[in-house]
């Protein structure tokens, strides 16, 4: 039974990731005053299926000088971790109701760095290695602010269980009292998922495609699916943290519909940002984090810690 539950979670995630590629190409197309994919199937709806078939029937070529085991393990690990991070998400019921769901998600996102590092190093290509080093530095750096923002939000919620956030936000969305945190969180999720304008790992003019430059066919498709699964997961996480949906136990489908609409709108915002903004320089990316976001998030975290004490209130009870 548990295996059926897992499959019921994994298959829709992979399908959503596949169709997100189509949505992205369509959105970018219309924003650049062109049509986007419109040949394969009605309105190009079968394009992701055609892409998947093409990628998986191609021969997965491997550079002769690459490290075999790591080269193959890296994309499997990337997709495995991307899917694992969905386990504690309340939709409205999580797959496994964890006591420390938020910590689990932080740990899994930290492990994702290894798949990037392995792929860059095992490819035995200077472009892949430079791309991987950039990606690792960027991911590790932005995880610092993500963790502090999460801590601040959890201080208002009072529990590391994600389901508690639904109860906390029955009165008001946390985006209202914590809007500076929400803005910094959203920008940090863009950087964490290596999306434009922070997609320095795949600066086409410099590094061709970044850490996955030597990958082709199936393994490349695994990286691709991992990236899009992470994008959807991050937006769902944002919706849970700051735009909490109230859950009526008698009609759980209302929660799901509401939650999906919010996540979709946030995902569309990701695509809109990609169509609008140019890429940052690498030093600007690091300055934004270490000189702007980190001091601000630390100050706001201290503020949220001291607020209940100052107002003689009690901290949130779980």
From Swiss-Prot:
Any GO molecular function: NADH dehydrogenase (ubiquinone) activity
Superkingdom of the source species: Eukaryota
Coiled-coil annotated spans: none
Subcellular localization(s) per the UniProt record: Mitochondrion inner membrane
An annotated GO BP: mitochondrial electron transport, NADH to ubiquinone
Membrane topology of this protein: Multi-pass membrane protein
Enzyme class, first EC level, given as a word: translocase
Membrane-spanning intervals of the chain: 2-22, 70-90, 100-120, 147-167, 172-192, 222-242, 253-273, 294-314
GO cellular component assignments: mitochondrial inner membrane
Family the entry assigns: Belongs to the complex I subunit 1 family.
HAMAP family assigned to the protein according to its UniProt record, in alphabetical order: NDH1_NuoH (MF_01350)
Record function comment: Core subunit of the mitochondrial membrane respiratory chain NADH dehydrogenase (Complex I) which catalyzes electron transfer from NADH through the respiratory chain, using ubiquinone as an electron acceptor. Essential for the catalytic activity and assembly of complex I.
UniProt-listed PANTHER family: NADH DEHYDROGENASE SUBUNIT 1, NADH-UBIQUINONE OXIDOREDUCTASE CHAIN 1
Protein name: NADH-ubiquinone oxidoreductase chain 1
Organism name: Bos mutus grunniens
């Amino acid at each position: 039974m548990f295996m059926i539950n897992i499959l019921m979670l994994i298959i829709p995630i992979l399908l959503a990731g596949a169709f997100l590629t189509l949505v992205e190409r369509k959105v970018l197309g219309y924003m650049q005053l062109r049509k986007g994919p419109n040949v394969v199937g009605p309105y190009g709806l079968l394009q992701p299926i055609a892409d998947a078939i093409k990628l998986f029937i191609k021969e997965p070529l491997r550079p002769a000088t690459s490290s075999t085991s790591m080269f193959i393990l890296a994309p499997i690990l990337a997709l495995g971790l991307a899917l694992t991070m969905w386990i504690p998400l309340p939709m409205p019921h999580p797959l496994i109701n964890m006591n420390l769901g938020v910590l689990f998600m932080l740990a899994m996102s930290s492990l994702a760095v290894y798949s990037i590092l392995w792929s860059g190093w095992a490819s035995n290509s200077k472009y892949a290695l430079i791309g991987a080093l950039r990606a690792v530095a960027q991911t590790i750096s932005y995880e610092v602010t993500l963790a502090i923002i999460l801590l601040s939000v959890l201080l208002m919620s009072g529990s590391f269980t994600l389901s508690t956030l639904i109860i906390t936000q029955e009165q008001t969305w946390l985006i209202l009292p914590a809007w500076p945190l929400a803005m910094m969180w959203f920008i940090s999720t863009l950087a964490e998922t290596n999306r434009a304008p922070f997609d320095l790992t795949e600066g086409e003019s410099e590094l061709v495609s970044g850490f996955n430059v030597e990958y082709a066919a199936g393994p490349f498709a695994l990286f691709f699916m991992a990236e899009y699964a992470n994008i959807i997961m991050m937006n769902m996480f944002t919706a849970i943290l700051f735009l909490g949906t109230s859950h009526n136990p008698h009609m759980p489908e209302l929660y799901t519909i509401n939650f999906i609409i919010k996540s979709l709108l946030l995902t569309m915002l990701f695509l809109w940002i990609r169509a609008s903004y140019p890429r940052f320089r690498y030093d600007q990316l690091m300055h934004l984090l270490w000189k702007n976001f980190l001091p601000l998030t630390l100050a706001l975290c201290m503020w949220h810690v001291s607020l209940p004490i100052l107002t003689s209130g009690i901290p949130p009870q779980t």
